[in-house]
């Protein structure tokens, strides 16, 4: 029997200021992945979060486990926070981004959020 691990994906909306609302949409809503297999979570921004002056994408990924605050995994779309296992990786640019867990572990069961920080209230 294949052990299935449910990875719950959620949606984070970040309301911007002068640039107009930037809406972040994640897919899929939930994902069933076997332990040891790859999990892929997509995030789409309603407008580009790539800042042309420094060529950086203002996009972060967070992991939240029950009863705990969100933990930063990835910033600048693809830079892993210190201490985050290398099975977590981020990719994408402009409006389309992906978080990949290359080999899902039991401790990875959580809610995952993408967040733009290109514009803030």
Swiss-Prot record:
It comes from the Eukaryota. Residues 21-121 form the Ig-like domain. CDD domains: IgV_L_kappa. Residues 115-121 are annotated as: Complementarity-determining-3. Residues 1-20 form the signal peptide. Residues 21-43 are annotated as: Framework-1. Pfam families: V-set. Keywords: Adaptive immunity, Cell membrane, Disulfide bond, Immunity, Immunoglobulin, Immunoglobulin domain, Membrane, Secreted, Signal. It is found in: Secreted; Cell membrane. Residues 61-75 are annotated as: Framework-2. Residues 76-82 are annotated as: Complementarity-determining-2. One of its GO terms (molecular function) is antigen binding. Residues 44-60 are annotated as: Complementarity-determining-1. Disulfide bonds join 43-114. Residues 83-114 are annotated as: Framework-3. One of its GO terms (biological process) is adaptive immune response. Immunoglobulins are composed of two identical heavy chains and two identical light chains; disulfide-linked. This is Immunoglobulin kappa variable 4-1. It comes from Homo sapiens.
